[in-house]
Amino acid sequence: MLYRIARAGIFKLDAEKAHDLAIQNFKRFNGTPLDIFYRQNLASKPVEVMGIKFKNPVGLAAGLDKNGECIEAFGAMGFGFVEVGTVTPRPQSGNDKPRLFRLIEAEGIINRMGFNNLGVDNLVENVKKAKYDGVIGINIGKNKDTPIEKGTEDYLICMEKVYQYAGYIAVNISSPNTPGLRTLQYGEALDDLLSQLKEKQKELAEKYGKYVPVALKIAPDLEDDELTQIAESLIKYKIDGVIATNTTLDRSMVEGMKHAEEMGGLSGRPVQTRSTEVVRRLKELLGDNLPIIGVGGIDSYVAAKEKMVAGAELVQVYSGFIYKGPGLVRDIVNNI
């Protein structure tokens, strides 16, 4: 109820200004009496996935805390894990504004942010300072001005810098807002990326005496033969997990709505069904070879359960959290 009242005011603001204000307030309130407005003491629902123990299976998806500024605040809300980023080797401002739009009647969001972030070094410092007893995933990407044929180098740079501070590393090759990025999901480009990531992972595991799992984040806009090829590559290169899915370019669910024609990736309830279909198909293809983290339109316990029945072992929320607030985390954790 409290969040519903607050949301009415928040939604009067431009979407990106509201996001920035929320991040500022989470930083300001954390550890003060004011964090009572979002702090939740939830029951432990431990699960082990990718060799990591999570205190519950509900995580924050990447994109909300790009620079790792509010890890403790999100932990206070009850998330079992927090995925920060996407982060790139060098700071970049992202695409031109406006670049974030609410589709309120569909409970969706369109973004064309373009990996705006303060760079991997800044994020690492924030992660090192965070006092959070959950799992921190770090989502990595490539800089916009890095040619796609050299994109693997950016992922390896980020991987080396975040490795010893990450609970797991998420490799984002599925954002529609960086030109050419999604081509890394296919054929030889994918195989080359995965083989080099595994080599680097082995090297870093020996260097630090610590094995950090790597998960690949994929798009929902894939044909069945493309999903099949991705699954085969994930198994071939012994990737530790897959995150399904990122945002969609499909607008069939929101035709005629305000902002529906804006360029960018659509998230929230409109992508719920398709992302669940991808999770289900991946489970058929992967079997027990590697776990699936389900994300896309999770806005209730029922939606989270659908992802898990389809084959996900962990779930993540983002758009649903924007529309429902911290109570969504409580609802899922208490009923899962």
Swiss-Prot record:
NCBIfam families: PRK05286.1-1 (NF003644), PRK05286.1-2 (NF003645), PRK05286.1-4 (NF003646), PRK05286.2-5 (NF003652), pyrD_sub2 (TIGR01036)
Keyword Cell cycle: no
InterPro entries: Aldolase_TIM, DHO_dehydrogenase, Dihydroorotate_DH_1_2, Dihydroorotate_DH_2, Dihydroorotate_DH_cat, Dihydroorotate_DH_CS
UniProt keyword list: Cell membrane, Flavoprotein, FMN, Membrane, Oxidoreductase, Pyrimidine biosynthesis
Pathway assignment: Pyrimidine metabolism; UMP biosynthesis via de novo pathway; orotate from (S)-dihydroorotate (quinone route): step 1/1
Active site, UniProt feature: 175
Localization per Swiss-Prot or TrEMBL: Cell membrane
Binding, FMN: 62-66, 86, 139, 172, 217, 245, 268, 297, 318-319
Keyword Oxidoreductase: yes
Family: Belongs to the dihydroorotate dehydrogenase family. Type 2 subfamily.
Binding-site residues for substrate, renumbered to this chain: 66, 111-115, 172, 177, 246-247
Recorded topology in the membrane: Peripheral membrane protein
GO molecular function, one term: dihydroorotate dehydrogenase (quinone) activity
Catalysed transformations (reactions): (S)-dihydroorotate + a quinone = orotate + a quinol
Cofactor binding comment, as recorded: Binds 1 FMN per subunit.
Cofactor(s) needed: FMN
Enzyme class: oxidoreductase
Subunit details: Monomer.
Enzyme nomenclature, EC number: 1.3.5.2
Gene3D superfamilies: Aldolase class I
Short name of any one Pfam family annotated for the protein: DHO_dh
Job description of the protein: Catalyzes the conversion of dihydroorotate to orotate with quinone as electron acceptor.
One BP annotation, GO: 'de novo' pyrimidine nucleobase biosynthetic process
Protein name: Dihydroorotate dehydrogenase (quinone)
GO (cellular component) term, any one: plasma membrane
